[in-house]
Swiss-Prot record:
Keywords: Carbohydrate metabolism, Glycogen biosynthesis, Glycogen metabolism, Glycosyltransferase, Transferase. The lineage of its organism: Bacteria, Pseudomonadati, Pseudomonadota, Gammaproteobacteria, Thiotrichales. PANTHER family: 1,4-ALPHA-GLUCAN-BRANCHING ENZYME. The keyword Transferase applies. One of its GO terms (molecular function) is cation binding. The active site is at D318, E371. Catalyzes the formation of the alpha-1,6-glucosidic linkages in glycogen by scission of a 1,4-alpha-linked oligosaccharide from growing alpha-1,4-glucan chains and the subsequent attachment of the oligosaccharide to the alpha-1,6 position. InterPro entries: A-amylase/branching_C, Branching_enzy, GlgB, GlgB_N_E_set_prok, Glyco_hydro_13_cat_dom, Glyco_hydro_13_N, Glyco_hydro_b, Glycoside_hydrolase_SF. CDD domains: AmyAc_Glg_BE, E_set_GBE_prok_N. It comes from Francisella tularensis subsp. tularensis (strain WY96-3418). This is 1,4-alpha-glucan branching enzyme GlgB. The keyword Transferase applies. Its EC number is 2.4.1.18.
Length: 640
């Protein structure tokens, strides 16, 4: 997958084809020659620095190697008229800190900038880039990569654990290193039964409270946890435990701290020229100019960098709506329509298609996931069929509706029954992932357990009911860390999760056990993931029982040999002698019950098989009569 261009120009060791494709916006390995790279020129070893700054008058490299002095010999030379600059510095070496002094050609004003392509950077509050040439790692995940290339994720289990590294666990209040995380995280994820971990952004960012979503160093590994080798070792360890790694990736906007990409050459460079398009007031950031060739190279090469160098298995693309809409988070008069008079960002659309097209062509088995909150059509439709080409899309509508529903007093749920059923009306329009992410447990939104209605018992029961319903609902799954053991406080990025409650309180231990059993149940039952995006895989038994707030539906495998019947009771009422239509004659056995005593429930379980009778119900010729426990999900399976 490496770039093989080798033709040289007269100015540097950068290939002529590299330069051509870079300015054409078609280079997908720009990180191989942009930034700081070890070189030997005319028999002398050193570092070649290369950057792009089309409106620069001059650029000087300063750093540890020259005592941070501006010297004539360290000024870059312009390679092209389109803004590519480069210089070879003999005495620069691995580990040296450095910056670029960029002078604007119109104002003569100069700025001190970090290297946009730096592989490593100083820990905040310091902002220098660090020469990093020792990045080789001996991987041991060949079997995983081979399996990944052959996997069809649509008909395989996908149960994602979303994770913020800095606050998952700490050591005496300090960040764990990637190596320390390697000793505990893979084992925990595997024991809990998750198939993937999703890391919130791992590129360098100055503000902890931004969670990584306002980056400055897109190619720089988050220095809070260690170095490049440490992160590679962590990913390798996860792969060796059969755990996929998804990375939150932010290609729409960037932090406006002065050492970063903002006005890199003293004028709009990585951002749009037009202020109404460039300035993102809502987030206090700048939007990338996605129509500029060199910016597209920067971003698509960045995606390739994380995938190639760190063996990342998928990218969750952040804030896709901000890329698609010119009027995103803007009032009338604060945005300029496109050439057709619409609000669609044509450059953003083209960029997303190009990104997904490149990854599909070059990175077999790597997936892309859109975090997109609007009703934009065909997000996960292939490019050749007119879509954007993402593999999956987060189902924000399902999340909003169902979280609202479970917060209601059960007395009033009958009047809002559509909130829990409406998702199946549009489910097959996209390849949805059901996500309960970090955004839902911060900023006054309450922790997941505190979203539940009722006293403490009903909150725990409601959580088990809701999670079991989620497992049964078609679509892949994602849950944010801490929910699995019932963290009561909202997520706080500045401290570790409240792991101590698992040892202190039986209810937390029981819920952690519940999540493990639920995840194992999901993984072991083909019907729960093989036909997520095929109408064959789901059928309502009764979607309309609003009076009792009970849902019932069937999940089926491709060959129809496995069928699971879900009954979800969203009230604290036990229903006796409940008649339920079933698709097949025979005996049915309980295979999962969220009311089980071992989970902290009331223990109203079905100890014996139930036989169907030839009586019509819910459109079926057979029916069973069961007891439905309160605030619980009951799952039955035909056994003979």
């Amino acid at each position: 997958m490496k770039n093989k261009n080798s033709e040289q120009n007269t100015h540097s060791t950068i290939g002529e084809q590299d330069i051509h494709y870079f300015h054409e916006g078609k280079h997908i390995y720009a990180y191989e020659f942009m930034g700081a790279h070890k070189a030997c020129e005319e028999g002398i070893e050193g570092i070649r620095f290369t950057t792009w700054a089309p409106n620069a008058k001059s650029i000087c490299v300063i750093g540890d190697f020259n005592y941070w002095q501006v010297e004539d010999k360290n000024y870059m030379e312009p390679i092209t008229d389109a803004g590519l600059w480069s210089v070879f510095i003999p005495n620069a070496k691995n580990g040296d800190k450095y910056k670029f002094v960029v002078t604007n050609k119109d104002t003569n004003h100069y700025v001190y900038k970090s290297d946009p392509y730096a592989f490593f950077s100083e820990l905040r509050p310091n902002t220098a880039s660090i020469i990093t040439t020792e990045t080789q790692y001996t991987w041991s995940d060949d079997k995983w990569l081979e399996k990944r290339a052959k996997t069809n994720y649509y008909d395989n289990p996908m149960n994602v654990y979303e994770l913020h590294l800095a606050s998952w666990k700490t050591k005496n209040g300090k960040f764990l290193t990637y190596d320390e995380l390697s000793e505990t995280l893979p084992q925990y994820i595997k024991e809990m039964g998750y198939t993937h971990v999703e890391f919130m952004p791992l590129h360098e960012h100055p503000l902890d409270a931004s969670w990584g979503y306002q980056p400055t160093g897109f190619y720089s590994v988050n220095s809070r946890h260690g170095d490049i080798i440490g992160l590679k070792r962590l990913v390798d360890k996860l792969h060796n435990n059969d755990i996929g790694v998804i990375l939150d990736w932010v290609p729409g906007h960037f932090c406006k701290d002065q050492h970063g990409l903002i006005y890199f050459d003293g004028s709009p460079c990585y951002e749009y020229q037009e202020p109404t398009k460039a300035i993102n007031k809502g987030w206090g950031t700048h939007n990338f100019d996605l129509g500029r060739n060199e910016v597209k190279c920067f971003l698509i090469s960045n995606a390739m960098y994380w995938i190639n160098e760190f063996h990342i298995d998928g990218l969750r693309v952040d804030a896709v709506s901000n890329i698609l809409y010119l009027n995103y988070d803007r009032e009338d008069g604060q945005w300029i329509p496109n050439i057709y008079g619409g609000h669609e960002n044509l450059e953003g659309i083209a960029f997303l298609k190009e990104l997904n097209g490149v990854l599909k062509h070059t990175c077999k088995g790597v997936i892309t996931i859109a975090e997109e909150s609007s009703s934009w059509p065909d997000i996960s439709t292939p490019i050749e069929k007119g879509g954007l080409g993402f593999d999956f899309k987060w189902n924000m509508g399902w999340m909003n509706d169902t979280l609202r529903y479970i917060s209601l007093d059960p007395v009033y749920r009958k009047y809002h029954h559509n909130l829990i059923t409406f998702s199946m009306v549009y489910h097959y329009s996209e390849k949805f992932i059901l996500s309960i992410s970090h955004d839902e447990v911060v900023h006054g939104k309450k922790s997941l357990i505190n979203k539940m209605w009722g006293d403490l018992w009903n909150k725990y029961a409601g959580l088990r009911l809701y999670m079991s319903y989620m497992i049964g609902h078609p679509g892949k799954k994602l849950i944010f860390m801490g929910s699995e053991f019932v963290q009561f406080v909202e997520w706080r990025e500045y401290e570790q999760l409240q792991w101590q409650v698992v040892d202190q309180y039986e209810s937390h231990k029981q819920t952690l056990h519940f999540f493990k059993k639920l995840n194992d149940f999901y993984h072991n039952e083909t019907a729960l993931w093989q036909c997520d995006y095929n109408h064959h895989g789901f059928r309502w038994i009764d979607a309309d029982n609003s009076q009792q707030s009970i849902l019932s539906f069937i999940r089926s495998s491709k060959d129809n040999k496995q069928k699971l019947i879900f009954i979800c009771n969203f009230t604290p009422v036990t229903y006796y002698d409940y008649h339920l239509g079933v698709p097949d004659a025979g005996s049915y056995k309980e295979v999962f019950n969220s009311d089980n005593l071992e989970f902290g429930g009331s223990g109203q379980v079905m100890a014996t098989e139930i036989f169907s009778s030839p009586q019509s119900s819910h459109g079926f010729e057979q029916r069973i009569t069961i007891k439905i426990p309160p605030m619980a999900t009951l799952v039955l399976k035909l056994i003979k």
